[in-house]
């Protein structure tokens, strides 16, 4: 990662850094307005820009600095944040573990949700009712994973445990908060 911009309370009203992730092989692939913004930081071209708020004691970063895996060492505890694998539109049996109905004996109620509310009073469905819909594909934080190995040559961090998202997805790794 490269620090593209440093936001300060004096200029922007809050303390944060803007990070550029995954550098392009060609700087020509970056749109012109973004290229001007990146040029100030000395970054040729990046695929993603992410902004992270800073807490107290993190004020030494400035535009152009690189963040590498050397920040971590084996046996450190980290939190890994990513987007979980999407499972598309799912019904209530898969999504909310509803029991469903009889499979035979003349039943025609197999995987349906059943009743979703009363009749004339309240004449509406209450918010938060469990129904079918988009399953997964949301931000997930896996806490307290242990750093097993740090490969500074390839800038790779190896952790023990589950990492959210499909193979090849991008994740945010931070020191464990607790």
What are these model-derived regions, one by one?
Residues 1-178:
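Extended basic (Lys/Arg/His-rich) segments that typically form rRNA-contacting surfaces
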